[in-house]
């Protein structure tokens, strides 16, 4: 996965996100922007940056305040919006073990032409006391209803540490706080394995699916150059949202299956575990969730674990999350040409069909897993889908 550092120079007036995770190394935050956002202005000390989407009337303002200036994120956000003469409704939410502030707002001072803007804002304490990160995501009020999903998606894509790459975002956490454990039973390899998810998980994940599909649909409907980056981002954000939700399930599966996997393949029990889970997914009930073009046809990961229907992308995404939680390097491959998805697992000693994924260290070859054809083992893929250039990787750090 590519990860760029923003260099805030006065002479640099445009920077294109293009589906990349944009990072400020100085303040230790990242944002997985929707496609098309560009920097239009910034301060040399990196404390302030303004973004505009080149396709949409969507804007973002980032301001990092010194830690000593405010006593809380709520105070930082209220001061930020007061400077902009904004009217706002505030709420607080604990995210990444920090009390954060969120607001919906309207302001007459954000847009160059003086028209009223509407949007969402958040303030988050940064690690190592590097300050309070205030982010405003907004549009002209006249088009807010059309762009609300994009604006919220941006705020929900803020990352402040390694752990936030693998748990629901701030907005989703605030809208769908944890409720209570929900017992589930997973039948795999002849075992009935008890586990738990949260009772809110399926509903919360569906919120993310619907929102991010709405964002992706804009790029697809207009056949924009960033369409495929937007598609990858769609799945990446679903994976990010799901990782923490299935963490206990991953642990329980690993605990119950490890001994048997070590007996099957003492030299490579990780490969044996991946194979067991692949066979398990091949027995799921096959069904696309929706046949409507304006709705995502992928079932949420928690709903699949509760017995819901699934197809290639939902299964591949599920296995990717489970295996990554078991510290097994994995990814998901998607193809527009083949209308299909595959699991990818990094198992250097395992023989079979692989797809190469580039990175800054020369790349890795991920062995593929076909989740919808019963009996196929790791390393086997449909004979009519072997052209590697037609596959794109969906990864998490």
Question: At which residue positions do the language-model features occur?
Answer:
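Sec-dependent signal peptide recognition
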Residues: 2-11
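N-terminal signal peptide c-region/cleavage motif recognized by signal peptidases
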Residues: 14-16
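N-terminal "mature-domain start" segment
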Residues: 20-45
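Surface-exposed amphipathic alpha-helical segments
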Residues: 37-38, 135-174
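Conserved polar/disulfide-associated segments of primarily extracytoplasmic proteins
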Residues: 40-135, 139-141
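Secretory-pathway-linked proteins and extracytosolic
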Residues: 186-248
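Secondary-structure boundary elements
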Residues: 234-307, 355
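Hydrophobic/aromatic-rich core segments of domains that either
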Residues: 267, 302, 314-397
């Amino acid at each position: 996965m590519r990860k760029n550092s923003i260099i805030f120079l006065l002479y640099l007036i445009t920077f294109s996100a293009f589906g990349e995770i944009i990072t400020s190394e100085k303040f230790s935050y990242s944002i997985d922007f929707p496609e098309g956002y560009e920097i239009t202005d910034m301060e040399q000390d990196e404390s302030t940056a303004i973004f505009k989407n080149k396709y949409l009337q969507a804007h973002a303002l980032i301001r990092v305040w010194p830690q000593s200036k405010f006593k809380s994120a709520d105070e930082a956000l209220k001061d930020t919006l007061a400077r902009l003469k904004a009217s706002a409704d505030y709420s607080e939410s604990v995210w990444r073990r920090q009390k954060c502030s969120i607001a919906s707002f309207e302001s007459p001072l954000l847009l160059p032409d003086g028209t009223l803007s509407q949007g969402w804002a958040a303030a988050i304490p940064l690690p190592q006391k590097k300050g309070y990160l205030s982010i405003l995501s907004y549009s002209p009020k006249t088009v807010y209803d059309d762009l609300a999903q994009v604006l919220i998606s941006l705020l929900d894509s803020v990352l402040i540490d390694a752990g936030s790459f693998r748990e629901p975002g701030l907005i989703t956490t605030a809208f769908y706080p944890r409720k209570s454990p929900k017992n589930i039973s997973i039948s795999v390899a002849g075992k009935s394995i008890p586990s738990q998810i949260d009772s809110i998980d399926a509903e919360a994940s569906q919120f993310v699916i619907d929102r991010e599909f709405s964002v992706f649909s804009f790029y697809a409907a207009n056949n924009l150059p960033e369409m495929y980056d937007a598609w990858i981002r769609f799945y990446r954000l679903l994976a990010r949202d799901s990782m923490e939700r299935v963490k206990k399930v991953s642990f329980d599966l690993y605990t119950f299956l490890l001994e048997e996997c070590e007996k099957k393949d003492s030299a490579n029990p990780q490969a044996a575990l991946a194979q067991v889970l692949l066979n398990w997914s091949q027995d799921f009930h096959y069904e696309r969730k929706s046949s409507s073009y304006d709705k995502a046809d992928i079932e949420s990961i928690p709903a699949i674990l509760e017995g819901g229907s699934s197809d290639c992308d939902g299964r591949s995404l599920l296995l990717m999350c489970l295996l990554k939680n078991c510290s097994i390097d994995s990814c998901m491959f998607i193809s527009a040409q083949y209308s299909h998805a595959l699991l990818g697992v990094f198992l250097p000693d395992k023989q079979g069909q692989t797809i190469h994924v580039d990175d800054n260290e020369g790349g890795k070859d991920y062995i593929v897993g076909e989740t919808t054809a019963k009996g196929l083992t790791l390393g086997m893929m449909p004979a009519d889908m072997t052209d590697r250039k037609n596959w794109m990787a969906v990864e998490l750090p």
